[in-house]
Amino acid sequence: MHMIYRLTKIDGDYATLIEEKSGEELFIALALLPLGVDIGTKLLYENFEFSIV
């Protein structure tokens, strides 16, 4: 199963993601996200890893 998130906020070493379908918020370390992410980036979460859409 895969989910699509949008990065909405960066606060120090952490990011806030919003899941597109449910609107659920996720607070995650930037180190777990791909290089080059910024506010507004769409991310695919699949097989326990994030990739830029």
PLM region descriptions:
Residues 24-35:
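Beta-strand/loop nucleic-acid-binding surfaces
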